[in-house]
């Protein structure tokens, strides 16, 4: 745990060094002032008892000044804590996102990776780094307070020091046990929390709400949500009951210790071992010691809990990343050569892609077709390096895709997927965000809008219209959003573009119309279209037919019809959708 504590403090110092230094200064000042104030009270009361009013007033002013100084230091301390929480939370959230971007796409198919990500996000959202640093500072501050007040108590009476120590030890034991229990509970509940959040967000997703109402399944989803919530709440309530009972017992023992200290102090006074000022100061010191020791032991016992939550963040940050290539991508390749590749998803025992070999020439237009589950999307992810082959190789010219430096490679690749993003931004941003350095290339944006048959948006004024209903912008039809997604892919100056069923939600005729526009625009690019419909297949140079993870046929439209194989069967089933 020591390495974890140093690592977390190092990150806090890296992000907010000035605030951290101010916290240390304020913490030390507060801690020392407690002991100084206790001693001053003893001196002040003795002067009052001896009726030395002039000196008493001076000491009273000093005591008041110490109280004010302590409060100012406390306010500055927590102001710095708020600043640290804000800066550290934002910076670590960004670094968490950057780490997620460096993981391979296939790693997100692993449930454990997703659970780690959820716990890491919770660590940031709930301010666990601030909790940990606060616990560390509390421990250091209370050590100074405990040491200084214990020194004063021991000067008054060693017995008072011993009683004060024994009265606060139960806090440490309870906090240590309950802290570990609470972390294990939250770790156990992480999967349930993901499920609960998913069900909850269904009611806020306007794409889902319509279906919930039409099918009348709101009550069913609500029941599942309440069931998940109630199970988690019951587990949490059971823990809280144990926690409350344990701390109530600790409070009782602490109060018993304080009463015992009063009795001991009175006996010492009666035996002339304490004077009046020392009596009051010893009781004040005992109370301060109990409070400081209590918070010290609570913070110390809570430290493993806080550290465990922070460890969740580093558990995700420390996930091994794929070794990235360093080879510069040569966009002048003559063809893409796929040699005997196979691939399976994590935690499965079947091949999603099985022993596929094929060639794709540069600037060739390709349609990959097949029924759902045939492996089309998986093949495209392998061709674009989003997944790595487990067997075989993919060559761009003579270069192996696994050796490419990713940033350089992806500058030359555009992908428009079925679950394309609807950016709640301006029309200009929706298109040019794929190559944002050319955001102000108005002529290119307008030309793409015309080519995608969206002339109503091609004026300069329309480019700055906010789209989407989230921020009171203009809502578009699904067809318009899909055309913008394709335009976004085309705006990027890439040598290869892939459409992975982005028009699947459209009717076959509209889909074919949009894809014909796409092929016309992309005639000087390597264009790959993935679809389970065959309407566009007449327009492409080559058709790849897939079934059960294998390529079963390759050829053009007429060649494959003549074979009367898998493509022929698909064509016969779908030909009624298209106008000949």
For the regions a protein language model found, what residue spans apply to each?
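An intracellular "coupling" helix at the cytosolic face of ABC transporter transmembrane type-1 domains
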Residues: 14, 121-132, 184-191, 201-204, ...
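Membrane-integrated ABC transporters
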Residues: 1-33, 54, 58, 77, ...
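Transmembrane helix-loop-helix hairpins at lipid-water interfaces of multipass membrane proteins
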Residues: 20-76, 150-182, 272-276, 283, ...
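Short intracellular "coupling" helices and adjacent cytoplasmic loop segments at the cytosolic face
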Residues: 95-127, 189-224, 315-326, 346, ...
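Cytosolic ends of transmembrane helices, especially the final helix of ABC transmembrane type-1 domains
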Residues: 217, 241, 261, 280-317
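Cytoplasmic coupling helices
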Residues: 79-101, 105, 163-207, 223, ...
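ABC-type nucleotide-binding domain
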Residues: 330-580
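Hydrophobic alpha-helical transmembrane segments of ABC transporter permease domains
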Residues: 29, 33, 37, 50, ...
């Amino acid at each position: 745990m020591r390495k974890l504590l140093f690592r977390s403090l190092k990150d806090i110092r890296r992000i907010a060094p000035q605030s951290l230094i101010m916290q240390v200064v304020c913490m030390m000042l507060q801690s020392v002032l407690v002991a100084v104030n206790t001693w001053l009270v003893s001196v002040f009361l003795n002067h009052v008892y001896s009726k030395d009013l002039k000196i008493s007033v001076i000491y009273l002013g000093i005591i008041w000044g110490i109280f004010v100084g302590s409060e100012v230091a406390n306010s500055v301390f927590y102001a710095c804590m708020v600043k640290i929480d804000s800066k550290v939370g934002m910076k670590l959230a960004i670094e968490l996102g950057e780490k997620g971007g460096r993981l391979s796409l296939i790693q997100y198919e692993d449930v454990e990776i997703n659970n780690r990500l959820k716990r890491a996000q919770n660590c940031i959202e709930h301010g666990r780094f601030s909790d940990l640093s606060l616990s560390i500072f509390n421990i250091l501050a209370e050590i100074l307070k405990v040491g200084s007040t214990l020194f004063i108590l021991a000067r008054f009476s060693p017995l008072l020091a011993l009683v004060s120590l024994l009265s606060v030890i139960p806090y440490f034991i309870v906090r240590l046990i309950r802290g570990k229990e609470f972390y294990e509970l939250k770790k156990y509940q992480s999967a349930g929390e993901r499920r609960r959040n998913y069900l909850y967000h269904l009611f806020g997703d306007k794409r889902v709400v319509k279906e919930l109402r039409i099918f009348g399944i709101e009550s069913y989803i609500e029941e599942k949500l309440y069931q998940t919530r109630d199970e988690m709440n019951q587990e949490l309530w059971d823990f809280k009951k144990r926690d409350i009972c344990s701390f109530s017992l600790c409070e009782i023992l602490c109060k018993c210790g304080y009463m015992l200290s009063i009795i001991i102090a009175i006996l010492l006074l009666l035996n002339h071992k304490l004077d009046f000022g020392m009596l009051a100061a010893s009781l004040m010191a005992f109370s301060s010691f109990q409070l400081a020791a209590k918070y010290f032991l609570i913070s110390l016992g809570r430290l493993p809990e806080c550290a465990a939550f922070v460890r969740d963040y580093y558990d995700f940050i420390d996930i091994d990343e794929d070794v990235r290539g360093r080879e510069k991508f040569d966009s002048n390749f003559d063809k893409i050569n796929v040699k005997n590749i196979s691939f399976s998803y994590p935690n499965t025992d079947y091949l999603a892609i099985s022993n596929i070999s094929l060639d794709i020439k540069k600037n060739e237009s390709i349609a990959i077709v097949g029924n759902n589950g045939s492996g089309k999307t998986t093949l495209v992810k392998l061709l674009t390096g989003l997944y790595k082959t487990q067997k075989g190789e993919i060559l761009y010219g003579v270069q192996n895709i696994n050796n490419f430096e990713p940033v350089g490679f992806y500058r030359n690749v555009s992908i428009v997927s079925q679950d394309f993003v609807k950016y709640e931004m301006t029309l200009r941003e929706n298109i040019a965000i794929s190559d944002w350095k050319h955001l102000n290339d108005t002529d290119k944006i307008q030309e793409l809008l015309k080519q995608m048959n969206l002339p109503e948006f091609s004026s300069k004024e329309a480019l700055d219209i906010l789209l989407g209903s989230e921020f009171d912008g203009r809502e578009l039809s699904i067809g318009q959003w899909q055309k913008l997604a394709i335009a976004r892919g085309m705006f990027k100056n890439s040598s290869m573009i892939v459409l992975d069923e982005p028009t699947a939600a459209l009717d076959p005729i509209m889909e074919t119309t949009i894809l014909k526009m796409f092929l016309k625009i992309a005639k000087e690019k390597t264009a790959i279209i993935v679809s389970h419909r065959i309407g566009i297949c007449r327009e492409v140079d080559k058709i790849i037919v897939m079934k059960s993870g294998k390529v079963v046929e390759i050829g053009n439209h007429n060649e494959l019809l003549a074979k009367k194989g898998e493509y022929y069967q698909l064509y016969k089933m779908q030909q009624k959708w298209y106008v000949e």
